[in-house]
Amino acid sequence: MPHRVTAPTPRSTGRSHILAPVKVGIVVPFSWSYWGGVNEHAFHQARALEKLGIETRTIIGHDPPGLQTRLLHPRAGRHDRPPADVIPIGRSVIVPANASLPNIVLSPSAIFRIRKLLREDTFDLIHVHEPMTPATCVASLVWARCPIVATHHAAGDLGWLRYGQHFWGHLLQRVDYRIAVSEQAKLSAERWFPGHYEIVPNGVQIPETADAGGRAATILFIGRHDARKGLEVLLRAWPEIHRRTGTRLRIIGADPLAVGLLMARTHVHDASIDVLGFVSEEELTREVETAQLLVAPSLGQESFGMVLTRAFACATPVVASDIPGYAAVLTAETGVLVPPGDVAALVDAVSALSADEPRRRALGEAGRRLAIERYSWDDIGRRLAAIYEGLLAQARAGSAA
């Protein structure tokens, strides 16, 4: 029988030590309508804080269904109504940045909505993600009148920050507490804005149980179709992987039309490839829990690798590119690293691991333990609550002085 690795009971399920009711505004510069790592982080951050008794509102873009959205955003997304604790502040546009194509809110109307919101709502603290991103995060730094926490996610050169560096630096002086999700994100931020950054990693939801063995004959890719995600490398490797293993490839998160064009360009026409596009959180967890392994063939500029820890939480082994952001998360006990962009190495690693169920089970169980010990959102939420508590205590002491 497959061994089931069960998540332990959280060490504390009580409320935060913050005595007075606290309301936190979580500011995200992207669109709620399009899946991405920062959006996912903010969503689970809000849930983790609410479990501790901290009220949250997520301030983020939203692209409702209609012709304008279809014209501005060719890729698939979710266009239903955001939940009640989400405050939509405007539409987004696609902006090439850091070898990716994020959907960033840039409209002037969003800036004025932020100003009105921060003047009228009673936030005790603002937590800004990617604080140097126009326009919502910059506007929040300008108009917030409460303690500010900022989390830096991106890794890479971030060379655009050289333009107006003194302006950005002046804005960052308004931040009371700087967080980076990884050492790579910290180094990238420190290059332009030296200072103290505490590393608080991306968290992951831990399923109650996970079978480390007995998986379906599927290989999983999760991510957008951005060039840096390495989907083209995996597609070039796939015909030989399929010939050796007989598995199916399931692609999640990437727009089906874009994947189809990429397959045509790489001359990969294989009936063993399923392109699922955007799926719900529940569907995504089911896919990861049942896959033989997850492949993360990114070419670079990854600060962390949330798809890796999601796989760990589901006891799913990983084959990933040997890039700094991934190598800091993946160990020899939880997966396999291969040179980025090396099709032959990817074929060999995936084929060998697919054929070795005992090794897959061992890697999956070790990854599950690592996720529970280091990346549980219950623990990350408590760390954030402690940071907030310290800042709010300082603010109260300053007001009383």
Where are the predicted features?
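A short, well-ordered alpha-helix in the C-terminal region of glycosyltransferases
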Residues: 352, 359-374, 383-385
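A conserved mid-protein helix/loop that constitutes part of the nucleotide-sugar donor-binding site
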Residues: 40, 44, 217, 224-240, ...
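Carbohydrate-associated surface elements
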Residues: 184, 203
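Nucleotide-activated donor-binding/catalytic signature segment of Leloir-type glycosyltransferases, i.e.
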Residues: 261-282
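Glycosyltransferase donor-sugar binding loop
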Residues: 62, 222, 247-261, 277
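Conserved acidic donor-binding segment of nucleotide-sugar-dependent glycosyltransferases
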Residues: 332, 336-344, 352-358
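N-terminal strand-loop element at the rim of the active site
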Residues: 11, 19, 28-35, 47-105
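Short hydrophobic beta-strand element within catalytic cores of glycosyltransferases
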Residues: 317-320
